[in-house]
Each structure stands twice: as C-alpha cells, then as structure tokens.
C-alpha cells in the first residue's frame, strides 16, 4: 500500500489479492479511480493472479507485485497502461519466492524498488526498469513489507516484530519481537492474551511525518499499534 499526494488530492494505491487487482482510490471519499486487473497484454496465461504489493515511481509509473502467484512484478504507466513485467518465481539470486511487499527506496538517486522476498528472508533492490541490482539484506525471518522514512526502513516480519534498517541497510533495532517463539506468525491469539508492545506477526507498517510508526499485526481480531518515536536523549 502507498499513500500519495497528487494534484487531484490524496490517493491510496493498494493490492487486493482476493479481487485479483491493484487499485487506486481517493483517501477521503473512498472512490476507486483506477483498477489494474491481470494485464492480458503481457502474453502470460494469468490463470492465477494474486497481487500483494503496489508502489509508485516519481513519474507516476505503477508497480504491482503478484506475490501469491507468479511472483512477476508488473509495470504500468500512471494511466494504467501495461508496460512490462519482470522477475519470476524460483530460488535463484534474481528470483522471488513470495514477493510479498514492495516500496520505493528513496535513499538512492534514482530511487530503487525495494522488494521483500518473504519465503527467502531477504530484501532485494531492482531498478525502475526492472533490472536486478543487489541483495540488500539476508537472514531475516519472513519480511512482509517495507516503508521508508528519512534514513530508516521499517520491515515487518511475520515471525514477530518490526526490523528497522538504517541508511546503510544494516539492522538498527527490532521492535516488539516476542521472546516466545510459539507467538510468532500466530494468527489466532485471542485479544485477552495480547501484550502491549509485543507483536504476534507483523504484516504491514507505515510512518507518519513525525516519525511515529503504525504497525498492523496479523491477527484474527485485527490489530494496529502506534509506536511513538522518542529522541535519543529521551531514550537514555
């Protein structure tokens, strides 16, 4: 999911895997202004199409990850015209095994796609033209998504907490990880057993302009937690 301020207002770009499409809708009214179903122009069979992530380039080009099916990344222009696809399912260096999350990494000029290869516990960089650049980090649990703010990247992990990476792509800290491994990737934890500040399986996150972090926990009852940023001095 991505939130963007555009000339016509504020819009949310989001993948809907159950509906087999990506959408763009007005953040205030909820009106859908663009739908991106499977692009038949790609020449692929499209028997399965279950997109999981969506992000937008500075020029408005749209990227849609088919993370629950082919693991292709589809590229469209800002009007929804199909342009190309890249990436594929597999276990080689340049392949994905559940391209579950994706965002624009603005630490670089030009920006890069930062893609979560969930089942292989790593993040990858691709260019906006679909060319493989590098592995960013390996050895994570099950990274589900990524969000960039300033020098930091938040990476929710389905096995527990939220990994925070610095500008050098190294781990700064892990937030809310449960010491009990039985509570990682645990969907059915009842609400009366929730622990404040501890996650059971983070699935999404987003920063606000003050650097506070909103984290969505993968839970049968639904759970969103706000983590308030503190200064380095206040943390001492």
Regions found by a protein language model. Give the residues of each.
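Beta-rich, blade/repeat-based domains predominating
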Residues: 1-10, 41-61, 91-112, 120-121, ...
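Short loop/turn segments immediately following the C-termini of beta-strands
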Residues: 17, 67-69, 107, 118, ...
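Blade-level signature of beta-propeller repeat domains, shared across WD40, Kelch, NHL, RCC1
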Residues: 198-236
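Short loop/turn segments that connect beta-strands within beta-propeller blades
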Residues: 26-29, 77-81, 127-131, 166-170, ...
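A generic tandem-repeat structural signature
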Residues: 2-38
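Surface-exposed loop and turn segments in beta-propeller and other repeat-based domains
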Residues: 33-49, 81-97, 173-197
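Structural signal for beta-propeller blades
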Residues: 20-23, 71-73, 121-123, 161-163, ...
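Residue position within the beta-strands of beta-propeller blades
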Residues: 14, 64-65, 115, 155, ...
């Amino acid at each position: 999911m991505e939130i963007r301020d555009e000339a016509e207002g504020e819009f949310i770009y989001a993948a809907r895997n159950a509906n087999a499409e990506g959408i763009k809708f007005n953040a205030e009214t909820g009106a859908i202004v663009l739908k991106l179903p499977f692009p038949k122009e790609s020449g692929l069979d499209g028997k399965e199409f279950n997109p999981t992530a969506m992000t937008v380039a500075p020029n408005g080009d749209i990227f849609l990850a088919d993370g629950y099916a082919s693991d292709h990344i589809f590229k469209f222009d800002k009007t929804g015209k199909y342009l190309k696809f890249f990436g594929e399912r597999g276990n080689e260096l340049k392949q994905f095994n559940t391209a579950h999350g994706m965002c624009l990494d603005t630490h670089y000029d030009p920006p890069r796609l930062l893609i979560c290869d969930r089942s292989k516990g790593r993040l990858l960089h691709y260019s906006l033209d679909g060319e493989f650049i590098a592995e960013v980090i390996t050895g994570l649990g099950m990274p589900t998504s990524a969000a960039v703010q300033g020098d930091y990247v938040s990476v929710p992990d389905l096995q527990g907490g939220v990994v925070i990476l610095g500008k050098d792509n190294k781990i700064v800290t892990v937030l809310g990880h449960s010491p009990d491994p039985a509570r990682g990737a645990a969907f059915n934890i009842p609400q009366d057993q929730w622990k404040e500040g501890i996650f059971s399986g983070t699935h999404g996150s987003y920063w606000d302009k003050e650097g506070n972090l909103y984290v969505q926990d993968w839970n049968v009852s639904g759970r969103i937690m706000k983590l308030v940023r503190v200064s380095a001095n206040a943390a001492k």
